[in-house]
């Protein structure tokens, strides 16, 4: 329950990404700066946190020992996650991006067989491959249907080319984020805390963000002061607060695939928060009745997940 509540809070701060990225795109800001500045701004904050804890050398040593794994999975979890999101913001609305992003509800569970763990069976260490948590997948399906329903009224008004430019990059991001996050949890194997892991991932991907920023300057010129401020807001609320909260929540339940799926599913509430945010900040209209049905399904799915530890799935599925 604790991990789920933290996940919900993370979803609230993550929603800032979709709303503010939409605002930046409306103001003519380039995705080069929206993506790179977020992580460039994140690094000093994270470094300060790790420095205060006196863990800087330990993190750097861990990176040195696992350089290849750190770079590959940090790039997958951060670069292949955020570049597509900011790119899509130039072609789609924040609510549609946040809705499409909820494919992570399903992708995280589909990726489960890619991960293994070592367990002791009859006194011997045995490598066991994770299985897809089908029960959690069923609950997530309820939420996913709700997300689809939310998008139907608005998506029907969008041209196909804009839909594809907004959808395909997010599809990549939706698989990259949980894959990178879970792989990095395996790499650190509990040796680093959440903030230390996020700091390390941001640090090793810094060269990529710098290159993206330079390319943006060469193609678009320097970013406007408003985009810099907005990117800073995203870095603080989504990059620092939301990322740390979410990674902390997933770390709590990392050894339980169903609970891990439940935490990842809390991110579906980003859609609700994004809709509210765009109504307040961008003046978008209140969703119609069909969309509200979708919101209700998302909330129902979250309620089921919230009490997952108190429900005997064996009794529920016994006769199915």
Specify the residue positions occupied by each region the protein language model found.
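Glycine-/small-residue-enriched transmembrane alpha-helix faces in small-molecule transporters
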Residues: 1-37, 140-141, 145-148, 156-186, ...
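Specific transmembrane alpha-helical segments of multi-pass solute transporters/efflux pumps
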Residues: 13, 56-101, 149, 237-255
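Hydrophobic alpha-helical transmembrane segments in multi-pass integral membrane proteins
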Residues: 14-16, 80-86, 145-158, 205-220, ...
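Hydrophobic/aromatic residues within transmembrane alpha-helices
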Residues: 24, 34, 87-89, 114-116, ...
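Specific alpha-helical transmembrane segments that line the substrate/conduction pathway
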Residues: 33, 40, 86-131, 258-280
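Hydrophobic transmembrane alpha-helices of multi-pass small-molecule transport proteins
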Residues: 46, 113, 131-154, 289-309
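C-terminal-most transmembrane helix of multi-pass membrane proteins
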Residues: 119-122, 258-320
